[in-house]
Amino acid sequence: MSFKFNEESFLDNSFNETLREKLTKMLNSRKSMDIKIDDHLSYANNRGSTSCSNNFDNSSSIKARDSKLDILKSDVKVCEVNFPTIPNLEILDLDVSGQPRALAKGICKISCRDALLQIQTEIEANSLLLYTNISPDFTTPLMIANDTFTIPITMTFSQIQLEAITNVFVKNSGVGISFNDVSLDFQFDCSIKLLQPHIAKRLRKSMQLVFKDVLPSALFNMSRSWFTHDGSSSQTTTDHSQEEGSRLIRLHRLTVEDLDLQDLSPVNMLKLSTLTSSRQTLSLHSTMPKYFSTIPGCLDRQNFRNFTSRMPCLSNYGGGSDDGDKHVPHIHNLQNKNLLPEEALEENDIDLKAILSIQTKIYERGISTNNDVIRPRRRKIRIKRAKKSIVNKATETSSNLNADSEITPVSSSHNATSSVNTITSLTTSSLGSTAGSSNSKNTNRSSSFTSSIMPITPLAQSSMNKKDGNLITLRQDSKVLDSMKYFTKIQDLHNIHASFNSSRETQDSNNRFRIASEMLPTKREISPIPTLNSFIEPNRRFSFVGLNHKTSHDNSWSVDEQPPPYY
């Protein structure tokens, strides 16, 4: 079953005006009720019917009337309501019974299109002021600049599309409607574009409250005039508002004196007493370096600077005097390092015990609550030893050899034999290491051969420098002058060597000229003979000592050819 509304009622602007007034009244009904309650409380307080507890009730009633933040600073005013398309109402089910409480009940479907609604109000832009209004006085800080800042705002809802399934109850006093299934869509426009997304999001979330509370109460109050006369309906509305206001007043007038203390929870009372006394228990005590006391609990933000300025630190140290004001700096920076001030160092007024106590307390504060010992950080210096390269080793070896082979001046008064033996041993060791880098085969063969050769005895010679007449400089003995080198250098000596090999069998019985053939090198194995200049280092002096060996026939050898050694 369905029917249509009369078009003439919608074409006339009277319906829109009536609906606008009703919506304005219902949107401000909650705030008007709070104002009435505040008026009754102020009137009762002026009469003196209550004690000082009423003052607390009067101040807290405004702050505690709603736990949520209220950003509205003025009444909500509905500026325009328009229905360009006539709404449609369809009755899906209807039940008429003779019960005294309800004349009829049914299920209806309401559809509305292209509706327009425009409202205006003022909001509070200072959100800090909103928090201070609802917070208790003993926890609210004192703000220097906490003035109100109101901004007018206009919100327009256009292209409203509404489809809803409702349950209708017709009673003796009015019509009650409950919305079960609601489909709502609209376009929102705000004068403050910065707040438009936030307000639109909150409005879409609050639509459920509108259809469950605001609209049913508005329709019920409007329908009460249909069933009763005008005078009686106004009187009934006034009585109802007065009864509700008096009930709320009685609730707010409730004090501790009117209640039995046994009904109060001791746990809640203990929490309240602890909360109120916490303001007086947060004392800093003495924060001097000698009388430092840690605060395990919380600390006020306004006293935090005083606390940090009196923290034990070497930068706050002023010397070893007992004056407490000397330890407190006038200006303290949290970024100051733990260093002694210049004044203490200049005046040489340093107390080692006070410095030790400060460092100990700073270390103890770094220990965690689980008694985990935190070891202090120590500076560690690690020295990495550089690995000696091969070049450095070779340099050191050559320097050691040069130091060992350095010729020292010998006095003439010393024993000539001991000096000659000493110089010979040094020369043999130095040249032996140099000659070791040659071919290993030649070295092995020459070693066994030179063991049977009589050593060459160098002769002392006077110094060439007249100024150093007391010094005797001897030429070093060298392995270059071995008989092995002489045989391989000169062709005639090589022939003599071959003749020795040919007559080896005939002279085997005498065993005089027995020379192992493998001890002498062949022509292919002959290596170039190093010259004496290759062994001479710069800034060294060498004196030449010739060989003075002669044969039995007094035939001396020439300078170019050295005679072979005798056996």
Swiss-Prot record:
Region: Disordered, residue numbers: 392-453
Ranges of residues in domain SMP-LTD: 1-224
Annotated GO MF terms: lipid binding
UniProt membrane topology term: Multi-pass membrane protein
One cellular component term from this protein's GO annotations in UniProt: ERMES complex
Segments of skewed composition (Polar residues): 392-416
Subcellular locations according to the entry: Mitochondrion outer membrane
InterPro entries referenced in this protein's UniProt entry, alphabetically: Mdm34, SMP_LBD
Domain of life: Eukaryota
Bias type Low complexity, positions: 417-452
PROSITE patterns recorded: SMP (PS51847)
Biological process, per Gene Ontology: mitochondrial genome maintenance; mitochondrion-endoplasmic reticulum membrane tethering; phospholipid transport
UniProt keyword list: Lipid transport, Lipid-binding, Membrane, Mitochondrion, Mitochondrion outer membrane, Transmembrane, Transmembrane beta strand, Transport
Subunit record text: Component of the ER-mitochondria encounter structure (ERMES) or MDM complex, composed of MMM1, MDM10, MDM12 and MDM34.
Domain remarks in the Swiss-Prot or TrEMBL record: Lacks alpha-helical transmembrane segments, suggesting that it resides in the membrane via beta-sheet conformations similar to those predicted for other outer membrane proteins and porin. The SMP-LTD domain is a barrel-like domain that can bind various types of glycerophospholipids in its interior and mediate their transfer between two adjacent bilayers.
Family from the record: Belongs to the MDM34 family.
Protein's job: Component of the ERMES/MDM complex, which serves as a molecular tether to connect the endoplasmic reticulum (ER) and mitochondria. Components of this complex are involved in the control of mitochondrial shape and protein biogenesis, and function in nonvesicular lipid trafficking between the ER and mitochondria. MDM34 is required for the interaction of the ER-resident membrane protein MMM1 and the outer mitochondrial membrane-resident beta-barrel protein MDM10.
Protein's recorded name: Mitochondrial distribution and morphology protein 34
Encoding gene (name): MDM34
